[in-house]
């Protein structure tokens, strides 16, 4: 069987390598537009920051090495320009010579990936305008940084790549501003209140977030001197564009392959609507496992999983690709890590779920162990089924562990009741006696069962605390101007507090506020709310009583 693969980064090379392990008799040829194959695109920002010292560390395989390891033929700098399904041929252009060639196939795999979105704005021809998609992009930016000519930079795009580039530039004493057209950084990845927390941490780290603004261009004589936005001009020596990507599928026009928003549609076996043509990776649309709706997931993890399944199917299997949960993790500015899987609260409501959510602040390991910190965990669940729908987590520690536990839980359809009693690993250097995830699940269960009456950070930010008296429940007074209440002294009616008065109980993380609420309820106080996340997550307005 002659298999032609278009694209040689993640999905394409995974298909080729796995297929030749499954069926050595296959003749596999890869055509790829670039000079490099199988490179770690997600590691490029860390090469810019010299965390990864050598370009070679990002190149998983050279074309020559890959050919020897797998038996596939790799032809670089070959750009596919047309697919002819009726002839079972692909027309490609040799970028070295300009010559047009045709390649036949029995089976065709389209894994052409995606390219950076290039906005139609003035000034992109200036020096020190950079993208961040290929090793060559990272090399150019790192060389400019090491030359000492970049003191101020604007990163356009507040997604993963943009924030990772910003962090690595700031670590080299470059003043960085991150702009994004969305209202918050990491749009669609985190709910707004968590994104706002990330923005505050960015500012604390000296990186200025500027959201809700449009990039309008760059100005300068030979190189970038200013970046123009819809709000104001920003002095800058460099502009890094990380404002999204677009699937590389324009060459498929007229092929008859069904498309959706520029991506290739496939079935559960990764077949297109055209016989003998398959697709995987950033150029293909996948399905959200929870909603069943189309979901574009241009992630290296998605590409590799889909590529492996596709290879097994080409070798005669019938393996279904189950789709994605929107899982991701990122290292962010300010010593913060972020993870998410499943639906955000915003997405869950849009999908029609009857949603309940909670924000917790929990220890990430035994509090007395060196290096202990906090996780901020937001859980979203369906009230009726009590099934977990999504998790968002922020912290300096191993947020991927919490995220991956949630991936398993959501995939297997676990209820919060099942998750609360899971036998998670514990030792002081790694976790708490009740795992941070399980602790958060317990808080959510208390809320679902009516034992915990709370005000969410989003509600607090929207003004829901109006009419409430804020009560400081910390171990020692911590909120200037607010009434202090010592939990250990609550053994009956509290002088000065009405039993029907609206009271907002606030502590550092939320736990002591809950304990205070529990005791006040026993003594007849019927109108209390505990602020989720406490002062660790929320900024308490200082108002005169």
Label for each model-derived stretch:
Residues 59, 152-153, 160-217, 299-302, ...:
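Rossmann-like dinucleotide-binding cores of NAD(P)H-dependent redox enzymes
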Residues 1, 283-397, 431-432, 436-463, ...:
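Mid-to-C-terminal Rossmann-like scaffold of FAD/NAD(P)H-dependent oxidoreductases
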Residues 5, 28, 109, 240, ...:
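Hydrophobic beta-strand scaffold positions of dinucleotide-using enzymes
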Residues 1-77, 160, 166-190, 321, ...:
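Beta1-alpha1 glycine-rich phosphate/pyrophosphate-binding loop at the start
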Residues 110-172, 208, 261, 266-268, ...:
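Glycine-rich dinucleotide-binding loop and its adjacent helix/turn
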Residues 125-149, 220-226, 233-309, 406-409:
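FAD-site-proximal beta/loop scaffold in flavoenzymes
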Residues 25-27, 69, 75-96, 103, ...:
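A Rossmann-like FAD-binding core segment of flavoenzymes
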Residues 418-428, 432, 439-453, 463-469, ...:
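Rhodanese-like catalytic fold shared by cysteine-dependent sulfurtransferases
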